[in-house]
């Protein structure tokens, strides 16, 4: 059984046509995932315009007893603070490869996607929500200096000159 969370109708149709004999259920929120007996299940989450990955979502995904949780995104979060089997896969991957990965194909260790730490990911989310520096430091319980260093690292990874340029990137619709 596969739970699929996406707003992309083309992606949904591709999965429906290639699903083989596996049962596939489209969901609109993580709370719709219900464990069905002892059946193993997988979860696919498309982050494009979903704004789904936050602390509550990560905690919810940890509690699930899913075989695999695949997140379709143009980035991956290194050292994600979760015990769940979460895999970040590029959204540009072919539907056929996505299904093979979903069914258990081994993922290569080398990942050419952008790689953010868990804190960098949370900082980017808060910046995109127009939070100021004091709100960010208090929310994440980090110092001003740590925030400055993390912002510099984010700007370096995204090749930005100013942090305000982050809103012009195509990647922001995934946060």
Swiss-Prot record:
Mention any one GO cellular component term assigned to this protein in its UniProt record. transcription regulator complex
Q: What induces it?
A: By acidic conditions. Could be induced by EvgA via the induction of YdeO. By heat shock (shift from 30 to 45 degrees Celsius) (at protein level).
Tell me the GO BP annotations in alphabetical order.
Answer: cellular stress response to acidic pH; regulation of DNA-templated transcription
Q: Which domain of life is it from?
A: Bacteria
From the UniProt record, which GO molecular function terms apply? DNA binding
Q: Which residues bind DNA?
A: 133-152
For the HTH luxR-type domain, which residue ranges apply?
Answer: 109-174
Q: Which UniProt keywords apply?
A: Activator, DNA-binding, Stress response, Transcription, Transcription regulation
Residues annotated as coiled-coil are none
What are the annotated disulfide bridges?
none
Q: What does this protein do?
A: Regulates the expression of several genes involved in acid resistance. Required for the expression of gadA and gadBC, among others, regardless of media or growth conditions. Binds directly to the 20 bp GAD box found in the control regions of both loci.
**Name of protein:** Transcriptional regulator GadE
Q: Which organism is it from?
A: Escherichia coli (strain K12)
Record gene name: gadE
């Amino acid at each position: 059984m596969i739970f699929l969370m996406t707003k992309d109708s083309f992606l949904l149709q591709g999965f429906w046509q290639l699903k083989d004999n596996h049962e596939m259920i489209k969901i609109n929120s993580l709370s719709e995932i219900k464990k069905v007996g002892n059946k193993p299940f997988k979860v696919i989450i498309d982050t494009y315009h979903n704004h789904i990955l936050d602390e509550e979502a990560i905690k919810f995904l940890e509690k699930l007893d899913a075989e695999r949780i695949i997140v379709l995104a143009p980035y991956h979060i290194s050292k994600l603070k979760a015990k769940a089997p979460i895999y970040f896969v590029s959204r540009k991957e072919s539907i056929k490869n996505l299904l093979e990965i979903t069914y258990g194909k081994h993922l290569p260790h080398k990942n050419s996607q952008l790689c953010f730490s868990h804190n960098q990911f949370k900082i980017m989310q808060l910046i995109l929500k127009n939070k100021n520096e004091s709100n960010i430091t208090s929310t994440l319980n980090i110092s001003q200096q740590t925030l400055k260093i993390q912002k510099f690292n984010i700007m370096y990874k995204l090749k930005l000159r100013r942090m305000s340029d982050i809103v012009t990137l195509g990647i922001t619709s995934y946060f």
